Amino acid sequence: MTLDLIKIRRDLHQIPEIGLEEFKTQAYLLERIAEMTEGKDFVEQRTWRTGILVFLHGSAPEKTIGWRTDIDGLPIVEETGLDFKSIHEGRMHACGHDIHMTTALGLLDQMLQVQPKNNMLFLFQPAEENEAGGMLMYEDGAFGDWLPDEFYGLHVRPDFKVGDIATNTNTLFAGTCEVLVTFKGKGGHAAFPHEANDALVAASYFITQVQTIVSRNVDPIQGGVVTFGSFHAGTTNNVIAETAEVYGTIRTLTQEMSLLIQKRVRQIAEGVAASFGMEVDIMLKQGGYLPVENNPALAKELMAFFDASPAVNLIDCLPAMTGEDFGYLLSKVPGVMFWLGIDTPYALHHPKMSPNEEALAFAVSEIGKFLKYKAED
């Protein structure tokens, strides 16, 4: 069948939902998938919570090729002014997952035209933004015997043009780790500081000391980010704060570096707390947001394939410090992630982010050729 990619994308754009709450999105996808797979006896399907797995049995399979897309939206008030803007208040597809899903449906439609030689898995994964849905599915056994031998996926990129595909042979996205540190002192009157134990001051010392992690503990060639964007302490001007809470993020290009920085954050927090004679709670939550590390051999193959296509402008790009939970699945299955240019002036997660829809036909055409090649390889 011939899919109306623009209509599908606009339909999906109007119903963004937060991770593990993608009920309308799942229902819409299941309807389209049912239409496409009718009469195709080589297709099986499973659901996992709000996720969907579509498996194409190959005619003479030697391996399983996987394509993964994410399906969730963000808690953002849309400001695009589009006729097809979000109908869910306070929710928006500001990270391009509507483009991702539409592309995946288009690719699935192409692969259904003729039974492939190799098996193929199309994964519509929930909760990329908030709960590391890929990790949840893997740990819950959702893949079963459908786990791919190779996994591929994309992410849209606003500052690249339509026709651009960008990746590299190592790390594409950073791993991320949430940090929440709470210092617990003793409150009191501002006039009697000697009778209190000021958690605000302790947290301030902590914030300044963690700045030395990147400058003195991290190899300058490897790099790393430690940022605290939230600091909450106290209630008014003349009361010494009993507790202080700081909330931040760690981003690194290797898991080894992430573990080093996490260790140093914990050591500094405990050291500062001890020096002030107070307690400290430390929460380090990485979950499934590991670095997105491409398999070098598969990345070279993919890059050579796209480089040979006149329609593709292949870019060998540097890593980005953005996070993506596909990193977890790529830690279990070799594969490749790449950027797809969508040519819009607004960044990902911006309330006015609006992709150039010409990217859809390009993506389905060019990536479809690659998947057909892999399906017959």
From Swiss-Prot:
The active site is at 70, 129 (proton acceptor). The keyword Hydrolase applies. The keyword Hydrolase applies. It catalyses: N-acetyl-(2S,6S)-2,6-diaminopimelate + H2O = (2S,6S)-2,6-diaminopimelate + acetate. InterPro entries: AcetylDAP_deacetylase, Amidohydrolase, Bact_exopeptidase_dim_dom, Peptidase_M20, Peptidase_M20_dimer. It is an enzyme of class 3 (hydrolase). Gene3D superfamilies: 3.30.70.360, Zn peptidases. Pathway: Amino-acid biosynthesis; L-lysine biosynthesis via DAP pathway; LL-2,6-diaminopimelate from (S)-tetrahydrodipicolinate (acetylase route): step 3/3. Keywords: Amino-acid biosynthesis, Diaminopimelate biosynthesis, Hydrolase, Lysine biosynthesis. Its EC number is 3.5.1.47. HAMAP family: DapEL (MF_01692). Belongs to the peptidase M20A family. N-acetyldiaminopimelate deacetylase subfamily. This is N-acetyldiaminopimelate deacetylase. It comes from Streptococcus thermophilus (strain ATCC BAA-250 / LMG 18311). The lineage of its organism: Bacteria, Bacillati, Bacillota, Bacilli, Lactobacillales.
